[in-house]
């Protein structure tokens, strides 16, 4: 492959890296925490990010404590 072709390939790979969506490696560390129902019993629906599933999953939250991987709505956890 010519040096021009290599430069083009390098440029395209760099552009792809910059434009790809945020991956799980770039997520804050709290996304690695498991869903935590907490000790209270005011059960309500919440969402958490599952690194194993690579998606947001609904779970039942007790209403207090828990951890930072806990969102009220799907929209909230995607932002």
Swiss-Prot record:
Native species: Oxyuranus scutellatus scutellatus (Australian taipan)
First and last residue of the signal peptide: 1-24
Disulfide bonding pattern of the chain: 40-64
Domain BPTI/Kunitz inhibitor: 31-79
Main location: secreted
Alphabetized GO MF terms: serine-type endopeptidase inhibitor activity
Domain of life: Eukaryota
Subcellular location: Secreted
Stated role: Serine protease inhibitor.
The keyword Lipid metabolism is annotated on this UniProt entry: no
Protein name: Scutellin-5
UniProt GO cellular component terms: extracellular region
Pfam family, one: Kunitz_BPTI
